[in-house]
Swiss-Prot record:
It catalyses: S-ubiquitinyl-[E2 ubiquitin-conjugating enzyme]-L-cysteine + [acceptor protein]-L-lysine = [E2 ubiquitin-conjugating enzyme]-L-cysteine + N(6)-ubiquitinyl-[acceptor protein]-L-lysine. It is an enzyme of class 2 (transferase). It comes from Homo sapiens. GO terms for molecular function: ubiquitin-protein transferase activity; zinc ion binding. Pathway: Protein modification; protein ubiquitination. It holds the Pfam family TTC3. Found in all tissues examined. The gene is TTC3. Residues 793-805, 1894-1912 have a biased composition (Basic and acidic residues). This is E3 ubiquitin-protein ligase TTC3.
Length: 2025
């Protein structure tokens, strides 16, 4: 790489400078991609399956032609074509992701959501290489006609939806590579690959052969010249940056170059080298693979690819790739040398790994040996450890050294990093619960590193420090290996720490950082080539972790760690973060003053931050290190500390030392509860529980709490008595409460003396208000009483219902938390009266699941259903108090149509609050919502709203932010609220939405008299006599601050709730404050400003005062809201509430705008009204903005050219694209405005993927799984990582949706965490030793002696894993394991549990072959913790019913016996299989090979289970002890209570005896009264029975009349509906008949026009023909002296005829237009066509014409038929033209001269009949008798046939003279005319267009007399050939439009064959046939019968020769008409 040239390297598409977004390779313009993938969509077309025989018959010829043409080309050309086809197949897989590409949906290695197209993980690479092997097979057999024909055949079958699995596998087998079959796996896995391969290859071969397409030229000409120039410019810049060793910037330029030239393989190879230098090995792997695909003979591309594999630790894989590269590049001698050297180096590395001992640890002797290592072999400085953005020169210098490490270390870095496994990026790491285990070489290679592979701290070394300090000497190579392993372990610990921090697992993070600090020595940190700041960042991470735990001890330790940073490491510049951390500690302790001091210090030290910091050895940015982020956080914390929340209590103990503060918060870390003591004088005294105990001990001698009741108040000056004691527990809940009611003596209040108003006008206004209030109250009471009486009369409920109503009234008085529900409850009566369609409302509520089916049925079952339904729904909503159901009820009401207008407007306004708040919610909490797992959301959405709304599958969060989708967005918020338990981080956001945003201040105007709300209760306040003024609005719910009174008192819902919760009873002003309050009220009444216009009427004042009041109001309004547009809704909303007088003032002024401009305070700017003082500021801002935009436009021009060498800290590359806002716990947390990403600076190179969007997954696609399968739980306190390019990446468990950024959504539930560094566990080769992970459903390699189909019954069982592992669905777009798939690796063996099931997408069949992997059922839960015996396992493999193991019959039939030697492969490495190793069973301990290891592993599993059971037992035991203690305490309590209750019972018994004596005396008196009352009751009952009998009779009569009236009304309504239906049907019939009549009249006129024009055209053609003959005769002027005059007369006649034709056409067109405009045909005058006669000419006689006139006559008929177009058909039978034995007869018939005595009509008879014979060719009888034409039969039987072949067949029927190649050429010409595409056209339309094109071509060609003569001249064999072949095809004129047909379509028909009689239409069965001269054949008997009445040929006569009646009723022509075809003259 020292000789660095342009062609040597270049870079591709992964821009990784800090925050450069990842570029997708599909940035390239869509127009450069060929439309190649249309053919694959045939796989999805709907159609009926084609029968195999029909398919073979139709396709065989075409495939044979294509195959023969393809194989006739040279082999070198074919191989080049195969390379081009390979690029086209892999283009959507590697270079360009298309949303609509079927390949990207079918192929498992394409992730449509993955925007990081540069990366390829190892699982995806395996699929790609398998696909490449399959594609390379076709190149090997490119000239083999047999295999190519088979390929084409299989491709056609797949396109026609015929399963060709067996043929495809056989083709691969015969192609010469059986090993591919072992890699393909089961059918579900391999079918997508095979289908893509065969269909793509078949398509491209067909395209090359049929269209003569040059794929090589298409690939070369993909890019335009401008793109090539730009790509070269970017490549040169990348070369320059590479030469300066600035690889990150070089990556950006190479990426830009690839955007312009994606087909250039050099760019990918060079970018791969840059990725290798920067440690991004997966990106280098992807670019190496792309380079080898584009140019498979380029050695450097293979070299980069093998390097990347070796860097990832895949040495065996790299070695195999190197061997393959040497074969491909054998013609390049220089490149082969590098590959050979690489081969040797890889072999040495493998040998070193295999030769090392397993008991030595590489970490132990590193530190001491480090000093003796030579400088040339020094280990690398990690380039990704700290990516600083330096602000000063010194820091820049340090960063340059750390980022590059010097030239001398670059090669060493490459060497050392080769042993580094795939943990280089934290997002690719295995699950922590699954330590990696390897087989064979993998095992020996990783036996040392297995100890450190897991991220779990339990698997790491116990004492890192001891390992590092232990000394022993090693060679330099071993020292490098040890160094790499040490750094691997350090990186793993650091990764565990910061990943746990990001996931809020603070204890795990603290454990990881603590272990790291214990192992690291700050004095020796430089020996690891780490800067001191890395150590300080680890200390900072530990402190942050302890802070997150939040317990008092951890908080103290965190404070010590922060102080340690400040004291011991002041030079590192992290003082700001340390002070901020100490402030957070104090903030956690609720010590706001101390926290404020530290936050202020941190704010002053922001400038000392060294720049944006990352966690050591990673690219994950520490969010707090970003200057903007830390500023924002500090401002938030300072604001919170300046205005701390109100404490829950204040300790009154003088010696209180609770964390140095007396304020008590429930959120205190050391909160243990408190006690609150209240006295009757409203004193409140509170103590910490500890302080209270101390106080009781020192002062009150441990007095019991209850004894303090009725004692003297503890406040010194208070004389009250303690009336209430409340004790709060440590959880903040009320633990116990003691209360004693103290009755206060009522003291008469002192009289209030108010100063009377001096203004008479104000006094009068007050009196008016009082009167109005009294009147309104009276009317409201009256109306309420009337309504209640009506309700009682209607419902007449029993007593229990009355009790329910009283309970409801009591509940109605209660205040609800939900303000929307409060509004609905308050106006329930209006809602009830305003809804007219109650049944519709209930149905909608049932469909929205607001009501359950039980509620719906109970509501319908009541008698007064219509009256009580709405009331029942509102009661139901109040009872449930569900915020979502309340909103849905409001939404349903807003969509009801039958609602009163006033109620509808109010409901719409209330409903619009939620829609308006939705946009604000998404803009404020968009970052948090992006983290959601949209797969879960899609499932919940479909479950809840699937039947009402469209699915959100495939949609992104940006879709919900659009204004058009606000309703769906609101439904998404409702869904989150209903499942809020699953989204804990969104609790505060959802509460803010429903409590504040959604339920804004609802202003309800005071109504007049009857409409006044009467449900609000009247609350009297003794001390406050002032009543609310009528002018103030009534506020129902206040989520945001609002003006509630004239003096702008701002209230909020929080204050209201706080007041309610703090107050112990109704508010009363204390006695000592009453005088002051009264004085204040009097002063307030005197000076109150009464200019609020809303909901009040202006008083009678002069107009100037009214106008000034309005001006004051609007100035105040504009000060609150700022400048507003005149068309703003706020003005119209305000105008609705204006009184009538105010509206009149505005109307007089001419509107609001002229009214406001009348005052100098207001100014209008760009139709925006603003205050004058604000206008000046706006103008200045606009000037600045204009200048700023100009500067930005100028700077954008040089954006690609100017790249400063100096790093810009403010550039977007060093900031994350997605800045997520921390979710605050409180609902009132401020929303930060700078959450959005900043714009790119002018000097920074523009990120190339800003416009790249993620691809939506198809509807049926399976869920995507993120690359590492690691969910990141996000809590409300965590600062969210926003860097898109950071090595850390958020992942989703199951996400079927596209995500715009790399930050993947996540579900809040935790799953198996994927950490560590060994995610590379794939099968590196497809041999017996390399096995896939358990989540890869691919068939592992089998030995050569084993068939690919292995029955499961023959497999020997394996041991059982401790738990069952679900299997991931196969070959979908997930290439990683998630929580539903896990791999367990133990010992040296891979054991996985997979599901064997049917061939469905969710289950795959895995045939383990020689691996012996046990196949367990996914449904079997009983197998999880049990070990099966050998027989049971065999039963499982043989298809046990419990485990549902099923084997495919096809797969089991192939092989019956499997050698048992397969089991050896489990325990013996591949390399030593052929060595002399004892593999026999070890008797007597095992009967079979491997049982000892199985028993050991089962024993280990049982040990683990026993440990778990023991731990569970200990926990249960502890819980049981606690429960027994509690129960014993309860038992003691109950015994004491029982004693007390016994004594009380004795007292009650004594009282009872006394009372019984009294009751006996009273009983005697009562019995006497009862006797008298019974007599009265008898009299009353008799009277009541009499009255009830009368009432029953009347009720029966009443019901009878009701039933009769209902029946009568029903019959009337039915009759009415029938009559209306008849009327409607009659109108429709009338319209239809009218349209048909118009169409009929138009068709009549068109027929008339055609007939008349046809006559004139015949005359014209005859005249033209005559002129031609005259021209021939005129050569002899002596013979014909009058020739010139004759020619002039004929030319004049010809011009008259043409004029007459145009005139006739115009007249008919005018009449057609008139009919279409409404006229009738009978009203129009008949078109007059002048009669034209041939000019008198005696010069030429028909007999003198030459013999060739027969041919001209034939041409005349042809031209005549061509003129008529589609209205007549050309019958080319020779009999029509009379070209039989006498060629001289045709001119006399077809070209008559003008005989003197014969009229014109008789002259035209011959030509008309000749043309009409073709029109009336078929009769219904003939249709019934003749067979179906072959063209149509073919179409009906082969409907799903290939469209191209069916088109060729149709055309060959119409034009039999052309072969398929010529017809294909015509199709190609038609396609070029149609913009080079026939998509969107049906087969009939294509046939029509091609037919028209062929006819146009024939018209253009001039007729050749010789050719015509040769074609139509009869020969001796003509009758025989004609009779054998049948009649030629005829183009029939289209009938009027019918269903499914177009008028312009030209259906192609086959004329009747010559094998049937023209009269009886029966097939000739005997030789009794008569053949006329015209060529028509008849039965002799039929023809004799015909000649009895006629003398002409039946087939050659006029138009009405064959009618629709039976043959007996035909209208035959008269005898005097002539037969020009048969008769002789």
């Amino acid at each position: 790489m020292d000789n660095f040239a342009e062609g040597d390297f270049t870079v591709a598409d992964y821009a990784l400078l800090e925050d450069c977004p990842h570029v997708d390779d599909c940035v390239f313009a869509a127009e450069f991609m060929s439309n190649d993938y249309v053919r694959v969509t045939q796989l999805y077309c709907d159609g009926v399956g084609v029968q195999y025989k029909d398919y073979i018959q139709s396709e065989r010829n075409l495939e044979f032609d294509i195959c023969s043409i393809w194989c006739s080309k040279p082999i070198s050309v074919l191989q080049d074509y195969c390379d081009a086809i390979k690029i086209n197949i892999f283009w959507p897989l590697l270079f360009q992701h298309q949303n609509s590409s079927v390949i990207s949906r079918l192929h498992p290695c394409v992730d449509a959501n993955n925007s990081r197209a540069s990366e390829i993980n190892l699982k995806k690479l395996q699929h790609l290489e398998l696909m490449e092997d399959i594609v390379d097979l076709a190149k090997k057999v490119a000239n083999d006609s047999f295999l190519i024909g088979g390929l084409l055949r299989i491709g056609c079958k797949i396109e026609n939806k015929i399963l060709a699995m067996e043929e495809a596998l056989n083709w691969i087998k015969y192609a010469g590579d059986v090993t591919i079959l072992t890699k393909l796996g089961s059918i579900d896995n391999c079918w997508p690959m095979l289908s893509i391969f065969f269909t793509e290859y078949k398509y491209h071969i067909t395209k090359i052969v049929m269209e003569d397409c040059n794929l090589l030229e298409e690939l070369k000409t993909q890019s335009c010249m401008d793109c090539i120039e730009e790509g070269e410019l970017m490549k040169m810049k990348g070369n320059e940056e590479f030469s300066k060793e600035r690889f990150d910037i070089a990556i950006i330029y190479y990426t830009r170059a690839i955007e312009y030239r994606p087909e250039n393989y050099l760019l990918y190879g060079n970018r791969a080298l840059c990725f290798l230098r920067t440690g991004q090995f997966r990106n280098a792997l992807g670019d190496g693979k792309r380079a080898t695909i584009l140019k498979n003979t380029w050695p450097k591309g293979h070299y980069r690819y093998c390097d990347a594999l070796s860097m990832l630790g895949e040495y065996d894989w790299a070695l195999q790739a190197n061997i393959k590269a040497q074969k491909l590049c054998k013609n390049d001698p220089e490149g082969i040398k590098d590959l050979i050297q690489q081969h040797v180096k890889l072999q040495k590395q493998i040998e070193d790994l295999q030769g090392r001992t397993a008991n030595k640890d590489p970490i132990k002797a590193f530190y001491e040996n480090r000093a003796y290592t030579p400088r040339s072999l020094s280990a690398p400085i990690f380039t990704t450890s700290l990516n600083f953005v330096e602000k000063e020169r010194d820091f820049r210098k340090i960063n340059h050294e750390m980022a590059n490490g010097g030239n001398q270390n670059l090669k060493v870095a490459d060497e050392a990093l080769k042993v580094d496994d795939c943990d280089c990026h934290p997002e690719f790491s295995p699950p922590s619960s699954q330590p990696p285990k390897h087989k064979g070489k993998q095992k020996s290679r990783n036996n040392e590193s297995e100890k450190f592979s897991s991220s779990s701290p339990l698997t790491l070394p116990a004492d890192l420090k001891n390992i590092l300090e232990k000394q022993f000497s090693k060679s330099s190579r071993a020292a490098h290996q040890d160094f790499a392993n040490i750094m691997k372990m350090l990186r793993s610990l650091i990764q565990d720490g910061y990943m746990a921090l990001l996931e809020q697992r603070c204890r795990s993070a603290a454990q990881a950082f603590t272990e790291l600090l214990n192992g690291l020595d700050p004095q020796k940190i430089k020996q690891l080539n780490l800067a001191m700041i890395n150590y300080v960042l680890v200390v900072y991470g530990l402190a942050i972790s302890l802070l997150g735990i939040g317990q008092p001890e951890e908080l103290s330790e965190a404070e010590n760690q922060f102080k340690r940073i400040i004291e011991h490491y002041p030079s590192e510049g992290l003082d700001c973060l340390a002070y901020c951390g100490i402030g957070k500690v104090y903030l956690k302790k609720n010590r706001f003053l101390e926290a404020l001091n530290h936050f202020e210090k941190a704010r002053t030290l922001i400038y000392r931050l060294p720049g944006v910091l990352t966690w050591p050895t990673s690219n994950v940015i520490i969010e707090e290190s970003q200057p903007q982020k830390i500023k924002m956080l500090l401002e938030k914390f300072v604001e919170e500390c300046k205005f701390p929340p109100v404490p829950d209590a204040i300790c009154c103990y003088q010696k209180c030392h609770g964390y140095s503060k007396i304020q008590i918060y429930i959120t205190d870390p050391d909160f243990k509860g408190f006690i609150r003591i209240s006295c009757c004088q409203y004193c409140k005294i509170e103590f910490h529980m500890n302080c209270w105990k101390k106080l009781k001990t020192t002062t009150f001698n441990d007095k019991i709490d209850k004894d303090f009741l009725q004692g003297i108040c503890l406040t010194p000056d208070c004389e009250g008595v303690i009336s209430k004691i409340i004790i709060f527990s440590s959880g903040g809940e009320v633990k116990c409460e003691f209360e004693h009611k103290v009755i206060k003596e009522k003291v008469p209040p002192r009289p209030i003396l108010k100063q009377k108003c001096s203004s008479l006008e104000k006094l009068r206004l007050k009196e008016d208000k009082k009167l109005k209030r009294k009147i309104q109250k009276k009317e409201a009471k009256k109306l309420a009483q009337e309504r209640m009486e009506e309700d009682l009369r209607e419902s007449n409920p029993p007593k229990n219902e009355e009790q329910k109503e009283t309970v409801d009234n009591v509940q109605r008085c209660q205040f609800l938390d939900d303000r929307i529900l409060q509004c609905i409850k308050q106006y329930a009566d209006k809602i009830k009266s305003g809804i007219q369609n109650t049944a519709m409302l209930l149905k909608e509520l049932l469909s929205w699941k607001v009501l359950s089916t039980e509620d719906y049925t109970t509501c319908f079952s009541s008698r007064n259903f219509l009256n009580e339904a709405v009331d029942y729904v509102i009661r139901h909503l109040i009872q449930e108090n569900n915020r979502v159901k309340t909103r849905i009820f409001l939404h349903v009401l807003s969509e009801l149509k039958e609602v009163e207008p006033k109620l509808a407007a109010w409901i719409q306004k209330l409903n619009s609050f939620g829609l308006d708040a939705t946009g604000t919610f998404f803009s404020r909490y968009g970052a948090s919502l992006k983290l959601l797992d949209f797969s879960i959301m899609t499932f919940l959405w479909n479950e809840k709203y699937g039947h009402k709304l469209d699915s959100i599958e495939g949609k992104q969060l940006d879709y919900f932010s659009e204004p058009a989708s606000l309703k769906e967005a609101r439904c998404l918020i409702w869904l989150l609220e209903e499942h809020r338990d699953k989204f804990p981080a969104l609790h505060s956001a959802l509460d803010e939405f429903f409590d504040i945003m959604d339920s804004r201040c609802t202003v309800l105007r005071k109504q007049d008299s009857g409409e006044a709300p009467f449900s609000s209760t009247k609350v009297k306040n003794k001390s406050k006599k002032k009543k609310p003024k009528d002018s103030k609005p009534m506020l129902v719910g206040s989520g945001t601050t609002s003006v509630t009174s004239n003096n702008e008192i701002i209230t909020s819902s929080e204050d209201h709730s706080n007041r309610n919760s703090d107050s112990a009873g109704p508010f009363a002003v204390p006695d000592h404050l009453r005088q002051d309050v009264e004085e204040f009220e009097a002063l307030y009444d005197q000076h109150s400003n009464e200019y609020v216009v809303r909901n009040k009427k202006l008083w009678d004042m002069n107009p100037k005062q009214k106008c000034s009041t309005l001006y004051d109001y609007f100035s105040q309004f504009l000060e609150e809201h700022g400048p507003l547009d005149m068309s703003n809704k706020m003005f119209s909303a305000e105008y609705e509430f204006f009184p009538e007088e105010t509206r009149q003032i505005l109307e007089k002024a001419g509107g609001l705008k002229p009214f406001l401009l009348g005052c100098p305070r207001f100014v209008v700017i760009d139709n925006c009204i603003a205050l004058k003082k604000v206008a000046s500021r706006l103008k200045k801002k606009r000037k600045k903005k204009n200048i700023k935009t100009k500067v930005e436009e100028i700077s954008k021009a040089g954006e690609y050219v100017r790249v400063k060498l100096q790093l810009n800290p403010a550039a977007r590359e060093f900031k994350p694209d997605v800045k997520s806002k921390p979710v605050s716990d409180s609902s009132s947390a401020p929303a930060f405005e700078n959450v959005k990403p900043k714009p790119v600076s002018a000097n920074s190179p523009k990120p190339a993927c800003e416009d790249v969007k993620a691809k939506p997954v198809s509807d049926n696609s399976s869920r995507q799984v993120s690359e590492d399968g690691q969910p990141k739980g996000v809590s409300s306190n965590s600062p969210k990582p926003g860097s898109e390019d950071a090595n850390y990446k958020r992942v989703s468990c199951n996400s079927p949706k596209p995500v715009l950024e790399d930050v993947k959504p996540t579900y809040w539930a935790q799953s198996h965490l994927v950490t560590g560094y060994c995610t590379y566990l794939p099968f590196q080769r497809f041999d017996i030793t390399q096995t896939p992970p358990a989540y890869i459903n691919v068939l592992p390699g089998l030995p050569q002696y084993t068939s690919i189909y292995t029955p499961l019954a023959s497999l020997s069982p394996e041991y059982q894993l401790p738990r069952s592992v679900p299997v991931v669905p196969s070959f979908v777009a997930n290439d990683r394991a998630d929580k539903n798939a896990a791999a367990y690796f133990e010992g040296h063996h891979l054991n996985a549990e997979n599901v064997a099931g049917h061939q469905i997408a969710s289950e795959t069949q895995i045939l383990e072959g020689s691996l012996g992997i046990s196949v367990k059922s996914h449904c079997s839960t009983g197998d999880a913790h049990t070990v099966l015996s050998e027989s049971n396992r065999n039963d499982e493999h043989c298809g046990n019913s419990n485990n549902k193991c099923e084997v495919i019959p096809e797969s089991t039939s192939a092989v019956t016996n499997i050698p048992h030697v397969q089991m050896v492969a489990i325990q013996v490495s591949w390399n030593i299989i052929h060595q002399e190793v004892n593999t026999e069973p070890y008797n007597p301990f095992e009967e079979r090979q491997g049982e000892i290891s199985r028993i050991e592993k089962e024993h280990q599993v049982l040990q683990d289970q026993l440990q778990e059971v023991y731990e569970n037992y200990e926990q249960i035991k502890l819980k049981g002890l606690e429960e027994t203690r509690d129960l014993e305490e309860k038992l003691k309590r109950h015994l004491e209570e029982n004693k007390i209750s016994k004594t009380e019972l004795d007292w009650f018994l004594q009282d009872l005896e006394r009372e019984i004596k009294k009751w006996q005396q009273e009983k005697k008196e009562i019995q006497e009264r009862l006797k008298s009352l019974k007599k009265k009751i008898k009299k009353v009952s008799n009277a009541s029975e009499m009255y009830t009998q009368k009432n029953d009779g009347k009720e029966k009569e009443h019901e009878l009349h009701l039933d009769q009236s209902l029946e009568i009304s029903n019959t009337l309504t039915n009759e009415k509906m029938k009559i209306e239906e008849y009327i409607k049907k009659g109108k429709e019939d009338y319209e239809e008949s009218h349209q048909r009549a118009v169409a009929a009249e138009v068709s009549v006129l068109e027929n008339w026009k055609e007939s008349e024009v046809y006559k004139l055209q015949i005359m014209e053609s005859q005249a033209e023909a005559f002129l031609k003959k005259l021209g021939l005769i005129s050569r002899d002027p002596a013979a014909y002296p009058d020739m010139e005059s004759d020619i002039r007369s004929w030319e004049l006649f010809l011009s008259n005829v043409t004029k007459e034709i145009e005139k006739a056409k115009s007249q008919f067109e005018e009449q057609i237009k008139a009919i279409k405009n409404g006229s009738r045909l009978s009203e129009l005058s008949k078109v007059q066509i002048s009669e034209l006669s041939f000019p008198a000419c005696n010069t030429v006689h028909p007999e003198l014409l030459p013999e060739s006139s027969g041919d001209d006559g034939q041409g005349l008929v042809t031209s005549a038929s061509d003129v008529t177009g589609n209205h007549a058909a050309l019958h080319r039978d020779p009999s029509v033209f009379s070209a039989g034995d006498s060629p001289g007869e045709a001119p006399s018939a077809l070209l008559p001269g003008p005989p003197p005595g014969q009229p014109e009509a008789t002259q035209l008879t011959g030509p008309k009949r000749a043309g009409q014979a073709a029109l009336s060719e078929r009769s219904p009888v003939a249709d019934r008798k003749q067979p179906v034409p072959p063209g149509r039969a073919a179409r009906s039987s082969q409907s799903p046939k290939k469209p191209f072949n069916s088109i060729i067949e149709h055309l060959s029927v119409v034009f039999p003279c052309y072969n398929s190649t010529e017809l294909a050429g015509f199709i190609k010409k038609v396609r070029s005319k149609n913009k080079n595409s026939l998509s969107g056209l049906s087969i009939d339309e294509i046939v029509q267009r091609v037919t028209e094109h062929i006819l146009d071509e024939q018209k253009k060609k001039k007729p050749n007399p010789g050719k015509d003569k040769r074609t139509y001249e009869p020969s001796s064999a003509t009758p025989v050939t004609r009779s054998s072949q049948g009649s030629p095809s005829v183009v029939v004129a289209p009938s009027p439009k019918t269903k499914g047909q177009k008028a312009e379509d030209v259906p192609v028909r086959i004329a009747l064959g010559a094998s049937s009689c023209e009269i009886c239409h029966e097939v000739f069965k005997s030789k009794n046939v008569r053949v006329l001269k015209c060529g028509h054949k008849y039965h002799k008997g039929c023809f004799k019968q015909w000649l009895k009445g006629q003398s002409a040929c039946p087939a050659c006569q006029g138009r009405d020769l064959l009618t629709e009646e039976s043959p007996s009723g035909r209208g035959w022509p008269s005898q005097n008409q002539e037969l020009p075809s048969c008769s002789s003259r």
